[in-house]
């Protein structure tokens, strides 16, 4: 699926071997969709042992592999305990500590559904305002990282199934035995908080448990059939079928195996950390100095080929439920190589179907500001957009038309994939049938820029189309066009 999966590591390994370096252990690869944590655990132990053997590190040096890598796949309740804590939770401080990020708080100004009433889906224009001063600076094309909260229903469902959770709102501190097992120390993974707060803001309760987590859970099953089934799911083939069919949340696992008696300390120590979600910023700070705009598709889907329970995207659902003035903990993440050209006279082609349009709104807002307030005339900026139907989900349609009238956008080309009685048209079709000469002129003749934003499958199809186009124009072989392509000013911001 990902054409450049682990590309940096693979390239580095090849180069090192070319330079006659000795490889201590096989290169490890981690796929977050397929047990990255377990893959790293196995690789780390193997590499550590290989390094000790190669460099003659003996036991007299008292070097040991940490228990978390060498211990068997069990969880021992006597190694953990909960103590009450008087410390109130400072959410921003806690999130900053857990994720090592400098957070700031924004407030929701408004939510606007960009789809028409004819659409069954929702894509939001999210307008956030800074608290107090202007706030941190950002550039068009950068991302806003948001720390969402899990759905209340999921959290409550888990709390109702925890065996030792009589006071879910009591602030507690998780303590663990030190390596020697002689005294208790505070676990640094989470700050003192209530179990409800941990499940809401800090812990990932929607990602399917790993095989290792299922193995640890099996000990809490009081029915033998449940324990055996959980053990069976630790086998790769069984696990992958179960995972990709059900994509279960942690609550759904507890519902599937109702005899599980899970203690609170297990949740606090074993559930993965809830990660921030990233969204392309859809505004220019020069154009809207005290605001950040986002373009957010509200994600809902059913598992089991449409027959399973309804699942909701964690962050998009959380955002959709916000009320005006609600706080939003966030931070800015720079995106290397996805900014407007330093030379504004250089032509650009922007390709962004669906919510892939998000960063390009910040581009045209910046160009509008530069034109109106700095007298800068930008080069040709051609936009290629795609959606299902012009009367349902053509995001920012009126704004695009306004940018054309004002000369900010040179042209807008749109492909629709769900027009009744007409063939599906995607952005790569437009490039091939309508813009082949313009693309070649911008990339080859004028050394301009081409930007692609959207999902990985679309980006792959666009890249394939462009390579064929360039190869035909310059009469290049497949290998030659690959080399040439890397020399072009070709920018991608893609997601899974």
Swiss-Prot record:
Catalytic activity: 2 L-arginine + 3 NADPH + 4 O2 + H(+) = 2 L-citrulline + 2 nitric oxide + 3 NADP(+) + 4 H2O
Activity regulation summary: Not stimulated by calcium/calmodulin.
Cofactor: heme b; FAD; FMN; (6R)-L-erythro-5,6,7,8-tetrahydrobiopterin
Post-translational modification: Polyubiquitinated; mediated by SPSB1, SPSB2 and SPSB4, leading to proteasomal degradation.
Co-factor note (free text): Binds 1 FAD.
InterPro entries in alphabetical order: CysJ-like_FAD-binding, FAD-bd_FR_type, Flavoprot_Pyr_Nucl_cyt_Rdtase, Flavoprotein-like_sf, FNR_nucleotide-bd, NADPH_Cyt_P450_Rdtase_alpha, NOS, OxRdtase_FAD/NAD-bd
Keywords, in A-Z order: Calmodulin-binding, Cytoplasm, FAD, Flavoprotein, FMN, Heme, Iron, Metal-binding, NADP, Oxidoreductase, Ubl conjugation
Binding site residues for FMN: 6, 32, 36
Pfam families in UniProt: FAD_binding_1, NAD_binding_1
EC number, UniProt record: 1.14.13.39
Binding sites annotated in the UniProt record for NADP(+): 121, 300, 355, 388, 417-418, 424, 426, 428, 461
Family classification: Belongs to the NOS family.
Subunit structure: Homodimer. Interacts with NHERF1. Interacts with GAPDH; induced by oxidatively-modified low-densitity lipoprotein (LDL(ox)). Interacts with S100A8 and S100A9 to form the iNOS-S100A8/9 transnitrosylase complex. Interacts with SPSB1, SPSB2 and SPSB4. Interacts with ELOC and CUL5 in the presence of SPSB1 or SPSB2 or SPSB4. Forms a complex with ASL, ASS1 and HSP90AA1; the complex regulates cell-autonomous L-arginine synthesis and citrulline recycling while channeling extracellular L-arginine to nitric oxide synthesis pathway.
Cited function: Produces nitric oxide (NO) which is a messenger molecule with diverse functions throughout the body. In macrophages, NO mediates tumoricidal and bactericidal actions. Also has nitrosylase activity and mediates cysteine S-nitrosylation of cytoplasmic target proteins such PTGS2/COX2. As component of the iNOS-S100A8/9 transnitrosylase complex involved in the selective inflammatory stimulus-dependent S-nitrosylation of GAPDH implicated in regulation of the GAIT complex activity and probably multiple targets including ANXA5, EZR, MSN and VIM.
Protein name, entry field: Nitric oxide synthase, inducible
Lineage, highest ranks first: Eukaryota, Metazoa, Chordata, Craniata, Vertebrata
């Amino acid at each position: 699926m990902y054409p450049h999966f682990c590309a940096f590591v693979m390239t580095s390994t090849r180069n090192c071997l070319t330079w006659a370096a000795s490889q201590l252990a096989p290169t490890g690869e981690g796929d977050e969709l397929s047990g990255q944590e377990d893959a790293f655990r196995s690789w780390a132990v193997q590499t550590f042992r290989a390094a000790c053997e190669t460099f003659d590190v003996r036991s007299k040096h008292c070097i040991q592999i940490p228990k978390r890598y060498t211990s068997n796949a069990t969880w021992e309740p006597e190694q953990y305990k909960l103590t009450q804590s008087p410390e109130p939770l400072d959410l921003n401080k806690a999130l900053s500590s857990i994720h090592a990020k400098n957070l700031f708080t924004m407030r929701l100004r408004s939510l606007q559904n960009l789809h028409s009433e004819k659409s069954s889906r929702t894509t939001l224009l999210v307008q956030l305002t800074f608290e107090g001063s202007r706030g941190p600076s950002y550039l068009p094309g950068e991302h806003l990282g948001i720390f969402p909260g899990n759905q209340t229903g999921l959290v409550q469902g888990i709390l109702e199934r925890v065996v030792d959770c009589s006071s879910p709102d009591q602030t507690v501190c998780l303590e663990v035995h030190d390596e020697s097992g002689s005294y208790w120390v505070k676990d640094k993974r989470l700050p003192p908080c209530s179990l409800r707060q941990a499940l809401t803001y800090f812990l990932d309760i929607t990602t399917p448990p790993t095989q290792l987590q299922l193995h640890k859970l099996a000990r809490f099953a009081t029915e033998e059939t449940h324990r055996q089934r959980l053990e069976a799911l630790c086998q790769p083939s069984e696990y992958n079928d179960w995972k990709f069919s059900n994509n279960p949340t942690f609550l759904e696992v507890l519902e599937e195996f109702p005899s599980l008696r899970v203690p609170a300390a297990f949740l606090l120590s074993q559930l993965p950390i809830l990660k921030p979600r990233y969204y392309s910023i859809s505004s220019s700070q020069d154009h809207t100095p005290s605001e950040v705009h986002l373009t957010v598709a509200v994600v809902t889907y059913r598992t089991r080929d449409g027959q399973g329970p309804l699942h909701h995207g964690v962050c998009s659902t959380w955002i959709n439920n916000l009320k005006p003035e609600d706080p939003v903990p966030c931070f800015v993440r720079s995106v290397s190589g996805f900014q407007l050209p330093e030379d504004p006279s250089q032509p650009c082609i922007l390709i962004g179907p669906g919510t892939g349009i998000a960063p390009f709104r910040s581009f045209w807002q910046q160009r509008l500001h530069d034109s109106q307030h700095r007298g800068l005339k930008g080069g040709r900026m051609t936009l290629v957009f795609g959606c299902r139907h012009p009367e349902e989900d053509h995001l920012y349609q009126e704004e695009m038309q306004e940018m054309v009238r004002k000369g900010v956008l040179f042209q807008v080309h749109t492909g629709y994939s769900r027009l009744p009685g007409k063939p599906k048209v995607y952005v790569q079709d437009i490039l091939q049938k309508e813009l082949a000469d313009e693309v070649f002129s911008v990339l080859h003749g004028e050394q301009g820029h081409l930007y692609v934003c959207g999902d990985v499958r679309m980006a792959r199809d666009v890249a394939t189309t462009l390579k064929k186009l360039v190869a035909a124009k310059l009469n290049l072989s497949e290998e030659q066009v690959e080399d040439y392509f890397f020399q072009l000013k070709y920018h991608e911001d893609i997601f899974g």
